[in-house]
Amino acid sequence: MPLHNLTRFPRLEFIGAPTPLEYLPRFSDYLGREIFIKRDDVIPMAMGGNKLRKLEFLAADALREGADTLITAGAIQSNHVRQTAAVAAKLGLHCVALLENPIGTTAENYLTNGNRLLLDLFNTQIEMCDALTDPNTQLEELATRVEAQGFRPYVIPVGGSNALGALGYVESALEIAQQCEGAVNISSVVVASGSAGTHAGLAVGLEHLMPESELIGVTVSRSVADQLPKVVNLQQAIAKELELTASAEILLWDDYFAPGYGVPNDEGMEAVKLLARLEGILLDPVYTGKAMAGLIDGISQKRFKDEGPILFIHTGGAPALFAYHPHV
């Protein structure tokens, strides 16, 4: 088995049973293509989401190092920060979050509702900054201040997206391959590509487990030119950790994130409404709505390699719907 080295890494259990992989009959009829969805939005902790897969590895490493505090960063409405804070609460750890307002809004819902509301429920210590211009350096500086207060901090990068955290999505690729075996031959997999860990982990895992399937990353914050090196660097770092080769081409579509990260667009919001009305499944305005807009347009523009079944990776994020209301 090519991914046997995964078992070498300490890992906590936050997810339990494999998340559902479901066929979407009404959505498939609407698009004229077989569409399946991987439901990481229903992971049974803190309203779910993809970062919990990464945090299984990262939090295990934090405990191994004797940390009593998790430190991370993101937007005010960061799903990653919300999930990190929940993990800290579950493990009896302190959590410090460095937050920015990337869209410069003064809207009350954005500043206080959705994920930001949940941070208060998890008793998160909030530190605001003007912008996360150099988040790794800013997190290290924050960790130094927290350590000076007597804590033992463990820094988790934005999105949990380092080689260790991204192992969670190599593990997810294993889960997907097992669920598809003998049931469906997936031609294409679509995922939102942001901090790059989810995309890169899937790239490594699927290359070895489902090599005939293409993986499309729909960018949510950057052009292909800016996003590609992030994904490739993580892909290679993961492969090194697992003592594997990773040579699969990284495919990115950057036509769907405008006008920028965290700013909803019409195509993304139409995708949110469509899946809600046809399947009762909630996407979000920042990540999955834009990624689904890419899937929908990709079918109409014949951008996929063939007309076979497509798997959409639902990474979660529904709490943001409340934060972006009434603009949703």
Swiss-Prot record:
Matching Pfam families: PALP
Catalytic activity: D-cysteine + H2O = hydrogen sulfide + pyruvate + NH4(+) + H(+)
UniProt-listed GO biological process terms: D-amino acid metabolic process
Cofactor(s) essential for the protein: pyridoxal 5'-phosphate
Superkingdom of origin organism: Bacteria
Record-listed E.C. numbers: 4.4.1.15
Keywords annotated in UniProt: Lyase, Pyridoxal phosphate
GO terms for MF: D-cysteine desulfhydrase activity
Record-linked InterPro entries: ACCD_DCysDesulf, D-Cys_desShydrase, D_Cys_desulphydr_bac, TrpB-like_PALP, TrpB-like_PALP_sf
Covalent S-S links between cysteines: none
Enzyme class: lyase
Residues the record lists as N6-(pyridoxal phosphate)lysine modifications: 51
Subunit note: Homodimer.
Protein function: Catalyzes the alpha,beta-elimination reaction of D-cysteine and of several D-cysteine derivatives. It could be a defense mechanism against D-cysteine.
Family under the similarity heading: Belongs to the ACC deaminase/D-cysteine desulfhydrase family.
PANTHER family on file: 1-AMINOCYCLOPROPANE-1-CARBOXYLATE DEAMINASE-RELATED (PTHR43780:SF2)
Protein name: D-cysteine desulfhydrase
Biological classification of the source: Bacteria, Pseudomonadati, Pseudomonadota, Gammaproteobacteria, Enterobacterales
